[in-house]
Design a protein with these regions (language model features):
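Non-catalytic cap/lid and distal C-terminal segments of serine-dependent acyl enzymes
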Residues: 1-276
């Protein structure tokens, strides 16, 4: 395999930022020699892309399926061009993809590109993926912050201003282009074959402090009304942590790339260990 971290310069942000890249160059015979797709993985608030490398088994799952992983940093931007900060959305959607294509061979076909994220990154995956349905065949949010007004209300005014003020400005008004419900409505208006497959997951115990389960159930109800062609919502026992997101990634790979993969991995996990 090949894994490297690089610093790339963003003209939009007037700064360099890190991107991690896993490239499966020693694929097992059953996978074959061709890269099957690209997963862009987005991190959560107060963290960076290293989390996707250190905590789940993302690289092993990518190797199993012949997937390239692109894992950028995005600060605490909620994957938007910030009102009082840097232009992360422009970097992630315009500059970074162009630079990476110059550096390495990445599949550009729609059916081979996917984006996923956890927590803040779950919102980010929906924010970017639904705004660019022509780029991504699959969009996945794991324990995503999918209802920012609900989250702000729960946080209280002072904390909400500290977290969201730099992103959206003093009034904390979410612009239409950053509303994932509005973006989902635009996607649903497309012909079914032009719509990405959308997967959202949430843990049944992921309630406090930010009501993630409630946020996702409310978003689920909105999506049922909107009616995109391909939307799935899954929930099971779990809290806001990496065991849940590791399993969520397996479900995303199963749904987008390799049907049956989740059953295999769940079988691996459930197999009893016998003492001889």
């Amino acid at each position: 395999m090949a894994f490297f971290t690089c610093k790339l310069y963003s003209a939009a942000m007037a700064a360099s930022t890190r991107v991690r890249l896993y490239y499966p160059c020693d694929l097992p015979p059953e996978v074959g020699n061709q890269v099957k797709g690209v997963f862009t993985l987005l991190h959560g608030f107060s963290n960076d892309g290293d989390d996707w490398v250190h905590f789940p088994a993302a690289i092993r799952y990518a190797a199993d399926n012949g997937l390239v992983l692109v894992i950028p940093d995005a600060g605490n931007s909620f994957y938007n061009d910030m009102a009082w900060g840097q232009a992360w959305y422009t970097w992630l959607t315009e500059e970074m993809p162009a630079l990476l294509r110059q550096m390495v061979r990445l599949p550009e076909e729609w059916e081979k590109n996917f984006i996923a994220g956890m927590s803040m990154g779950g919102y980010g995956a929906l924010r970017i993926g639904l705004a660019h349905p022509e780029r991504y065949a699959g969009v996945a949010s794991f324990s995503g912050c999918v209802d920012l007004p609900m989250m702000m209300e729960k946080m209280g005014q002072q904390a909400a201003r500290a977290v969201f003020g730099p992103v959206f400005g003093e009034g904390l008004q979410i612009p239409p282009q950053a509303s994932i419900v509005r973006l989902a409505e635009q996607v649903a208006a497309l012909t079914p074959e032009m719509q990405p497959d959308i997967l959202c997951t949430a843990g049944l115990q992921d309630r406090e402090p930010y009501r993630i389960l409630e946020q996702n159930r409310k978003f689920r109800d909105a999506m049922k009304q909107i009616g995109p062609a391909k939307y799935t919502y899954l929930e099971w026992d779990g809290v806001h942590e990496w065991n849940f997101w590791d399993r969520s990634l397996v479900y995303a790979i199963d749904r987008f790339i390799n049907p049956g993969y989740a059953a295999k991995k769940l079988g691996d996990w459930a197999a009893p260990a016998k003492e001889e």
